[in-house]
Amino acid sequence: MVGFCAAALAFGRVASVLQSIELLLAVMGPRPAAFVRSFEPARHRTGIDPLVHRWIRGRDLVALLLVLQRMLRESGSIERFFIAGDDPGASDIGPALEAFSTRALQTDLTAAYGRMPKRAGVCYFFPRPSGGSACKRLNLFLRWMVRSDAIDLGVWTAVSPARLIIPLDTHVIRLGRCLRLTRYISPGWKMAAEITGSLRALDHADPVRYDFSLCHVGMMNACGFGRAQGSRQCPLRGVCRPKERVRN
């Protein structure tokens, strides 16, 4: 429960992300799952309505909690709700994400919005590959839940790490181009899937294992892409080809 809420708000400046997550968890209390199960908008929204994260407002968080509540009531956990729409035979997790977000947004959200707005903030929490979205935050959540090592929690057992798609942030986009892991220029599901496919050639069983390293090369400002002289400190110096971009 905490992982999903954290991933849902993982956009924007790191300090702002951490602050928003802390504020939401403070409202949810020491037992977040129990809070979600007993969540009542009329009773609890006074603590949530003041919360703002970028364009997300309190009512969007109320809607998110209603969706999570439905998952718990219908399936017992987010994992069971997710795998109900999964096809283990699918080559990657894309079809399962499509079903997951579609079913999630079928939740009755009248208590959050009254009449559902066309661009309701809750839709941002549940993007779909069919819309072209890279589904970065959902893929980040799945990485945390499915992979098991010193970085990720690995508390889900029904999904294979081999089927995960890399969370496509700005650092992965840049390095994916530089390392020729993708020929796409425009970020989206196709780029995320192609980068993952390239990484799968290195580790078919766990292609997303490289996400943390790729992301942090960029976060540590070690990548020389875009600098006049490059960077002598860049660990990828000599293997990247930033100018080779072929298709949209």
Please report, for each region that a protein language model flagged, where it lies by residue.
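HhH-family (HhH-GPD) DNA N-glycosylase catalytic core used in base-excision repair
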Residues: 1-248
